[in-house]
Amino acid sequence: MNWENESSPKEFILLGFSDRAWLQMPLFVVLLISYTITIFGNVSIMMVCILDPKLHTPMYFFLTNLSILDLCYTTTTVPHMLVNIGCNKKTISYAGCVAHLIIFLALGATECLLLAVMSFDRYVAVCRPLHYVVIMNYWFCLRMAAFSWLIGFGNSVLQSSLTLNMPRCGHQEVDHFFCEVPALLKLSCADTKPIEAELFFFSVLILLIPVTLILISYGFIAQAVLKIRSAEGRQKAFGTCGSHMIVVSLFYGTAIYMYLQPPSSTSKDWGKMVSLFYGIITSMLNSLIYSLRNKDMKEAFKRLMPRIFFCKK
């Protein structure tokens, strides 16, 4: 597959908010804090889910996948952004830009599918509790996770090849923090409408189908929870599912804004802020939401922290 055409520059210039110098330091601080929290939070979740036998369940298997994904998601872009801001170095090589684009798209699409799988897990747990162990068996969970990752990377290859093969006529100034589809399409010197239509189709498949399945799942969950007579049971069900719904709303809301409208209609600065939110801030919030709002996770932290830091059995 040819990732480079005759009009491809050797490097790109990432403009970011370079026209607003006063934003550079606050942005650097926000990115550094967010990235630190994301690393600490997601690594902690992964360790607890792996080390605590009580969390060896489908729900926490998928949560471990989500933590790995969020860790990779932010690491793909944030370190380079911090270097660009801190060293006032705005360039990225063509190969680096291609890597950014492929990995960022792949992880984003994988998260879309993984969140849908997690909502199905909650649906089975709440609405089909007697069949939960049979339906959500080890091999089914493994296949669903593998399916999410494979489809995510397959979608990335398709969208990246369509975007990168557009003629750019030497244009190399990317008005963004990193290489993303809407920003790269604006560099093209040809009519992008046919490509935008194809990208829109893939985005509908990856975004709207999973979010529709999630809404259907939570419709059934809400009906089942309202039938629970125990107030404690309702609270536990809403608590577990509420964390997932917050994550879904934050991620899908911002991703749909960016990818289900033509790049030309996206406000330049607003598009950058939305990308920062769903690409970086959401990953940080995921770890906080799942660790602080989840009773099982908090109890597991309390059990494991003494063993980790004081080597007590």
Swiss-Prot record:
Topology of the protein relative to the lipid bilayer: Multi-pass membrane protein
Taxonomy, superkingdom: Eukaryota
Cytoplasmic topological intervals: 50-57, 121-139, 220-236, 293-313
Gene Ontology terms describing biological process: detection of chemical stimulus involved in sensory perception of smell
Subcellular compartments: Cell membrane
Pfam family, one: 7tm_4
GO cellular component terms listed in the entry, alphabetical order: plasma membrane
InterPro entries found in the cross-reference section: GPCR_Rhodpsn, GPCR_Rhodpsn_7TM, Olfact_rcpt
Extracellular side: 1-25, 80-100, 159-195, 260-272
Transferase as UniProt keyword: no
Covalent S-S links between cysteines: C97-C189
GO molecular function: G protein-coupled receptor activity; olfactory receptor activity
Chief localization: membrane
Glycosylation site residues: N5
Transmembrane region(s): 26-49, 58-79, 101-120, 140-158, 196-219, 237-259, 273-292
Keyword line: Cell membrane, Disulfide bond, G-protein coupled receptor, Glycoprotein, Membrane, Olfaction, Receptor, Sensory transduction, Transducer, Transmembrane, Transmembrane helix
PANTHER family associated with the record: OLFACTORY RECEPTOR
Protein family: Belongs to the G-protein coupled receptor 1 family.
Role played: Odorant receptor.
Name of the featured protein: Putative olfactory receptor 2B3
Organism: Homo sapiens (Human)
Organism phylogeny: Eukaryota, Metazoa, Chordata, Craniata, Vertebrata
